[in-house]
């Protein structure tokens, strides 16, 4: 049976198997603490994410289950992948993934990016999104800090905790404001994979300009800034707004014309401007898809249709409408972890489920 080692990180107890050493804090998220560690089995550096009290409420248990299922299902070079998972004696859950040295947010705040890096990063984002969207998954929270990069400029999309099924009736409050698609802000009713394309467009613009494109102070200000550049939304988009208050607000705004993006991005290539124009479109159905973006002239230096795979099968979202007690989520989670280790060839199941 595995030996568990305890360490205090930022006042939090990290309780991990002795396979991992040299714990160093990397970052704190809303639902967990991430540390770097050395995997003594593979001699690689890894990221270890502790999910705090995953079984404290049904909502948190379901969220953790969803993240685990997504990490297990999504297998692609531009998407973060799971290398281990275990439950500690204290019943915290630990996800172990590859460790990349930095993220796009840190890169963008440290120095301007050269053209070839912008191209290569955008290509990898779109390559990852093509795969994720083909699996029937919408990321919903794409932003520079969720895009990890290593010293070879390999890029991986991470943090699928908010990800949801492709569903025309999707609802709710997601995504950091600057990168949030207008249909999320406006309708609060239905959106699809196109929200990720908008977010990627905002990230693309930030790489070109070195600062956020739409830095809104709140929802109202955010939408106002968007219309200053992209003009007033067309009537057919306005007519999809379900909330009367939102509709009143949008109709109260002064009519604005779309500004040429060339005026804003004076140093960018024409092909970069053209692709950005196709990503930042109010009407989601007229936005370029990830597959179309990969074939665009701007990404031509990297585009290879034979090496831009789609998912083998759609992600199974059947659990997502379930309203279950914590104990049921716990049993389902244990089952998923056992399945993961059986498939991956775990040496010993007792290591994953120590006696309580």
From Swiss-Prot:
It is found in: Cytoplasm; Nucleus. Dually phosphorylated on Thr-171 and Tyr-173, which activates the enzyme. Phosphorylated after osmotic stress. Residues 20-299 form the Protein kinase domain. Signal peptide: none annotated. It catalyses: L-seryl-[protein] + ATP = O-phospho-L-seryl-[protein] + ADP + H(+); L-threonyl-[protein] + ATP = O-phospho-L-threonyl-[protein] + ADP + H(+). Its cofactor is Mg(2+). The modification Phosphotyrosine is found at residue 173. One of its GO terms (biological process) is stress-activated MAPK cascade. SUPFAM superfamilies: Protein kinase-like (PK-like) (SSF56112). This is Mitogen-activated protein kinase hog1. It comes from Trichoderma harzianum (Hypocrea lixii). The gene is hog1.
């Amino acid at each position: 049976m595995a030996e568990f080692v305890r360490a205090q990180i930022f006042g939090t107890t990290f309780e991990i198997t002795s396979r991992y050493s040299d714990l160093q804090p990397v970052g704190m998220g809303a639902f967990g603490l991430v540390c770097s560690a050395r995997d003594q089995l593979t001699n690689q550096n890894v990221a270890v994410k502790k999910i705090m009290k995953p079984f404290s409420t049904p909502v948190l248990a379901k969220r953790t289950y969803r993240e685990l299922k997504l990490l297990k299902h999504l297998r692609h070079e531009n998407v973060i992948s799971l290398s281990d998972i275990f439950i500690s004696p204290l019943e915290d859950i630990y996800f172990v993934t590859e460790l990349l040295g930095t993220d796009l947010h840190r890169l963008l705040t440290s120095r301007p990016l050269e053209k070839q890096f912008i191209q290569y990063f955008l290509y990898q984002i779109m390559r990852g999104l093509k795969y994720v969207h083909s699996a029937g998954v919408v990321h919903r929270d794409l932003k520079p800090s969720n895009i990890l990069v290593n010293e070879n400029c390999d890029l991986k999309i991470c943090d699928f905790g908010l990800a949801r099924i492709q569903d025309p009736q999707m609802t709710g409050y997601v995504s950091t404001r600057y990168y949030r698609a207008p249909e999320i802000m406006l309708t609060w009713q239905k959106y699809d994979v196109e929200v990720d394309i908008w977010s990627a467009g905002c990230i693309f613009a930030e790489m070109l300009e070195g600062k956020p494109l739409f830095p809104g102070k709140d929802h109202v200000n955010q939408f106002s800034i968007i219309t200053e550049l992209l003009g007033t939304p067309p009537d057919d988009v306005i007519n999809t707004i379900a909330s009367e208050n939102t509709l009143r607000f949008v109709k109260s705004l002064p009519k604005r014309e779309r500004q040429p993006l060339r005026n804003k991005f004076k140093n960018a290539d024409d092909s970069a401007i053209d692709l950005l124009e196709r990503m930042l479109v109010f009407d989601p159905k007229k936005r370029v898809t990830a597959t179309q973006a990969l074939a665009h002239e701007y990404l031509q230096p990297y585009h290879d249709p034979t090496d831009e795979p789609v998912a083998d099968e759609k992600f199974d979202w059947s659990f997502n409408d379930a309203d279950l007690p914590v104990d049921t989520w716990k049993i389902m989670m244990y089952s998923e972890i056992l399945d993961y280790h059986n498939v991956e060839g775990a040496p010993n199941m007792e290591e994953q489920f120590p006696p309580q």
